[in-house]
Amino acid sequence: GKGSVSAFLRSMAEAAGLSCHVYNSPHLCRFNERIRLNGNFISDDELIDVLSEVEGVNGSDPITFFESTTVAAFLAFSRHPADLLILETGLGGIFDSTNIVPDTACTIITPIAFDHEQFLGSDIATIARQKAGIMRSGRPSIWARQQPEAYAQLQQQARQLCVYVQTEGPVSYTHLRAHET
């Protein structure tokens, strides 16, 4: 799933000598696991500082737990230089708080299944349309094997955005243009 993919990417980046920040959810044992700064989990002190800062700036405006955690992570990331940032979506899709980054290098879509149905939809095609919302125009997107109805939705969005798509198999990209069928 998403967590395994982000762990694998982080491992490859660090093995290549890159400094890397990672945002994951949910955590396994400690909340600090959600925010990794250059290979290390955020310290308790820094976590308290960024969460307090987010709470102070936000005031009494409505904000979800995931949104405040995401903002705290971005705040921590902004204070530590890194070569690479790996973001794992929470709900995964159009309305996910991690989806505010306008210019991603690449997106990865793991197998789409029934999850977060109250937010994403009650059928695979609807969920896939939501998850396709992380793709960016002209940027590569790597997809795990998908159910046919999910694949069709991903492909439709990829065409609209002229996304380079890599699915299972050797590394080569298919550039889906809006006029292709």
List where the protein language model places each region.
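A conserved segment at the C-terminal end of the G1
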Residues: 4-19
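Hydrophobic beta-strand scaffold residues
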Residues: 20, 141, 164-165
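Short gly/pro/ser/thr-enriched loop/turn and capping motifs at secondary-structure boundaries
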Residues: 28-30, 114-118, 173
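Conserved small/polar residues in nucleotide/adenosyl-binding loops
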Residues: 174-181
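ATP-dependent carboxylate-amine ligase catalytic core
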Residues: 15-102, 120, 148-149
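Conserved adenylation A10 loop of the ANL superfamily
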Residues: 1-5, 110, 174
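Conserved catalytic-core segment of NTP-binding enzymes
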Residues: 90-97, 101-160
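Aromatic/hydrophobic pocket-lining residues that form π-stacking "cages" and hydrophobic walls in ligand
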Residues: 9, 73, 154, 174
